[in-house]
Regions:
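Conserved catalytic region of serine esterases and O-acyltransferases that act on ester linkages
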Residues: 2-14, 29-31, 226-244
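C-terminal motif of bacterial Sec signal peptides marking the signal peptidase cleavage site
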Residues: 24-27
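Serine-esterase "nucleophile elbow" of acetyl-processing enzymes
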Residues: 29-93, 112-113
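Structural recognition of the beta-strand scaffold that forms the well-ordered cores
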Residues: 50-55, 59, 86-91, 120-126, ...
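Acidic/histidine-rich helix-loop elements
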Residues: 63, 88-106, 213
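Oxyanion-hole/transition-state-stabilizing segment in secreted/luminal serine hydrolases
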Residues: 104-139
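Active-site segments of SGNH/GDSL-like serine hydrolases
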Residues: 125-129, 148-179
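Catalytic His-Asp segment of secreted/periplasmic serine-dependent ester chemistry enzymes
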Residues: 167-244
Length: 244
């Protein structure tokens, strides 16, 4: 895989306050410079773009440390062609669209806490934590969460990345969650990306997934960074073009 050179941290982003630093397992960080008003989101190619990440422990660096989570990896060393970024990582360990995480939260809480009118992009990733929930209850919850994100940030682009698989033959319930998330993402006007169909983690499970069979290794987090960053930048460019 070809890697694009990356800027130094000090020339691109800086850490800003976390949504709740007191949460031990929250994995909730915001990184980037202060952003200008959202009144002119495409006014300048140098305008800071605010990205909100909604997700679970696959986005927090669980098992390796927050610094290794793919959102922090992008923020710490963005590609040379990336605009100035403020990445607000609201992901919570154990959370899902319907599943309540270790801090008592779901994706709905993350949207409420992190998505503001200033957001340029809201990225959803997951969630494998929803596999045991009844699809009949899960699907309307997914739809409501996307609607809430739209309401809180009408100008933002929505990018939805479905749950990954850890086998070339994923179980039926995983595919069912993927399918309903895709349906609701497209209904909400979001772009949907399918890690199962693209084989994100099954490319090399021994390298990318830790001994628990679920969470990324350090190398796996870098692999997710390499998958997510082009999607993020493409979505930001598309949003800027539409706004312009």
């Amino acid at each position: 895989m070809e890697h694009v050179p990356r800027r130094r941290l000090q020339s691109a982003v800086r850490l800003v306050a976390a949504l709740s630093a007191a949460l031990v397992l929250a994995g909730c960080q915001a990184v980037g410079p202060d952003r200008p008003s959202a009144e002119s989101p495409s006014a300048s190619p140098n305008a800071v773009r605010q990205v909100v990440v909604i997700g679970d422990s696959l986005s927090t660096g669980f098992g390796t440390g927050p610094q290794h989570g793919w959102p922090n990896l992008i923020a710490a060393s963005p590609r040379d062609d990336a605009p100035p970024l403020e990445i607000r990582n609201s992901a919570q360990n154990g959370s899902g669209y319907l599943n309540v995480g270790l801090t008592g939260t779901t994706f709905a809480w993350q949207v409420e806490q992190a998505v503001t009118p200033e957001a340029d992009l809201v990225m959803f990733f997951g969630s494998v934590n929803d596999l045991h929930h009844d699809p009949a209850a899960l699907e309307p919850a997914v739809a409501e969460i996307y609607a809430a994100a739209r309401q809180r940030a009408p100008q933002a682009t929505l990018l939805v990345v479905g749950p990954p698989a850890y086998s070339a033959l994923p179980e039926a319930r995983r595919l069912a969650v993927r399918d309903l998330v895709k349906r609701q993402a497209l209904a909400a006007g979001a772009r949907f990306v399918d890690p199962i169909a693209e084989g994100w983690l099954v490319e090399d499970l021994d390298r990318f997934v830790g001994p628990d069979g679920l969470h990324p290794t350090v190398e796996g987090n870098h692999h997710l960074r390499d998958k997510m960053e082009p999607l993020m930048l493409e979505a930001l460019r598309a949003g800027s073009a539409a706004a312009g």
